[in-house]
From Swiss-Prot:
SUPFAM superfamilies: Trimeric LpxA-like enzymes. It is an enzyme of class 2 (transferase). Homotrimer. It comes from the Bacteria. This is Acyl-[acyl-carrier-protein]--UDP-N-acetylglucosamine O-acyltransferase. Keywords: Acyltransferase, Cytoplasm, Lipid A biosynthesis, Lipid biosynthesis, Lipid metabolism, Repeat, Transferase. It catalyses: a (3R)-hydroxyacyl-[ACP] + UDP-N-acetyl-alpha-D-glucosamine = a UDP-3-O-[(3R)-3-hydroxyacyl]-N-acetyl-alpha-D-glucosamine + holo-[ACP]. Involved in the biosynthesis of lipid A, a phosphorylated glycolipid that anchors the lipopolysaccharide to the outer membrane of the cell. Pathway: Glycolipid biosynthesis; lipid IV(A) biosynthesis; lipid IV(A) from (3R)-3-hydroxytetradecanoyl-[acyl-carrier-protein] and UDP-N-acetyl-alpha-D-glucosamine: step 1/6. GO terms for molecular function: acyl-[acyl-carrier-protein]-UDP-N-acetylglucosamine O-acyltransferase activity.
């Protein structure tokens, strides 16, 4: 049986699984869908065309599914889609998409979103991502799986953050971070490969060694980006465990629109 506090407001039309818990003074809008075993904290607002999967925990005073902070927005029925097993802590704000993009903001599975984080319209957050307290994502930001964003960091709109990368606290990021790379500073600069994170996630010694070699090619050998990409493609075909991650690195660089941090 759904446990809804008597002070909570659940508007007609909301689709709420019978195992959901909704705390005091929370508000759930008419176009919201909430999956099994999800908990909605007190005073939080779940609005817009928002879908929450299963086993999510929404903290107190979170605002999920709000209108995009985009002056072009004209009340189109854009969406927010959140997967399963996410923790979204207190005072976090996550906005729906805009029609200028694909119209959907997405958050995958198993993410840890700490207090006061902002995820702007049209962001695409993957799986197993950590966004530390007060990290701020502008619109259209893309974050790959297992990325970690330090607290008090700001990320410019349309920036892409590669899988398994890490952005240090209080950083300002205005260009893309390639996968596997650590970055920090204002503005953020590269500081090596995320070796410890890769070890924890089961990357082999050969794969990590190949990524270290790729990092030297990209950042330490004095090459232009185009020259570096030629050598990176050679590394990606060397054979062994390092081929796939180095290939992923090259593909990310090739797809970059804002350019990568250098």
């Amino acid at each position: 049986m759904t446990r809804i506090h008597p002070t909570a407001i659940v508007e007609p039309g909301a689709q709420i699984d019978e195992s959901v818990e909704i705390g005091p003074y929370a508000i759930v809008g008419p176009h919201v869908t909430i999956g099994a075993r999800t908990t909605i904290g007190s005073h939080s607002v779940i609005e817009g065309h928002t879908t929450l999967g299963e086993d999510n925990r929404i903290g107190h005073y979170a605002s999920v599914g709000g209108r995009p902070q985009d002056m072009k927005y004209k009340d189109e029925p854009t969406k927010l889609v959140i997967g399963n097993r996410n923790t979204i802590r207190e005072f976090t704000t996550i906005h729906t998409g805009t029609v200028q993009d694909v119209g959907v903001t997405t958050l995958g599975d198993d993410n840890w979103i700490m207090a006061y984080v902002h995820i702007g319209h049209d962001c695409r957050v993957g799986n197993n991502v950590i966004l530390s307290s007060n990290a701020q994502m502008a619109g259209h930001v893309e974050i790959g799986d297992f990325a970690i964003i330090g607290g008090m960091s700001g990320v410019h709109q349309f920036v892409r953050i590669g899988a398994h990368s890490m952005l240090g606290g209080a950083s300002a990021l205005v260009q893309d971070i390639p996968p596997f790379v650590i970055a920090a500073g204002n503005k953020a600069e590269p500081h090596g490969i995320n070796v410890e994170g890769l070890r924890r996630r089961g990357f082999s010694a050969d794969a990590i060694s190949a990524l270290r070699s790729a990092y030297r090619v990209l950042y330490k050998n004095g090459l232009s980006l185009e020259e570096a990409k030629v050598q990176l493609r050679e590394l990606a075909g060397a054979g062994g465990d390092g081929d796939a991650p180095v290939k992923a690195l090259v593909e990310f660089i090739d797809a970059s629109q804002r350019g990568i941090i250098r």
